[in-house]
């Protein structure tokens, strides 16, 4: 303190409020006014304050659009997501239809449900597929005390599709699924990851988990993992989730990712 006395005194002076400074304003003039969203958003974009921009849009809403921009925006809106065309696979032969659909489309969203969030320790509980918007399936292989398909038979059935380089595999954090499948003898090929795409495009703008991306890009609130398994003392393993509930959750994951 003795050595830096001068700096300490300067710092004290800098933080001392001048209560004698003339303020020629009426208190009513300090009342919070309506934000000029367009002006605020323009400034935040110019300064590249992406996190603040995201927070501002969340607080004040989307900016006003011109007529042409509004028309473009309306054409980009997705149809509401429904689970009416989500299917629970109870016969292994039903998988053939989904394989054929994926091969014809040349792309398929793939998602795995497991017993653990650590892919190295996880056991496969189910697989969801989607090659057409609004249509997805869930293949249960590891739900406890419930009728599931034989895991080895399902893996053998899907192996050629998942390793086919001519069919693009789309995933959200697909590294997780890659590890799960690799442990079962499948090496995924031709992969694209929506989480990585989001990070490359908007690294600091928002979070890149599926729930956030669905809300931003599709205007759809997804079923959260916690809604399915619970929290705290009431939390259960995904392998204990009822098949119908698991189907709606897992198929939605694949559909939203696609």
Question: What positions do the PLM features span?
Answer:
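Short, solvent-exposed helix-loop connector elements
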Residues: 1-3, 23-34, 235-246
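Accessory alpha-helical DNA-binding modules that contact the DNA backbone or grooves
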Residues: 1-12, 21-24, 66
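Generic hydrophobic alpha-helical scaffold/packing signal
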Residues: 2, 15, 41-44, 57, ...
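Short coil/turn segments at secondary-structure boundaries
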Residues: 12, 16, 24-31, 54-58, ...
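Charged catalytic cores and adjacent phosphate/nucleic-acid-binding surfaces used
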Residues: 12-13, 48, 194
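Non-catalytic alpha-helical coupling and interface elements of nucleotide-dependent molecular machines
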Residues: 16-22, 45, 49-65, 202, ...
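Long, highly charged low-complexity segments
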Residues: 26-127, 141-145, 150-161
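Active-site-proximal helix-loop-helix substrate-binding element of RNase H-like nuclease domains
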Residues: 80, 118, 122-258
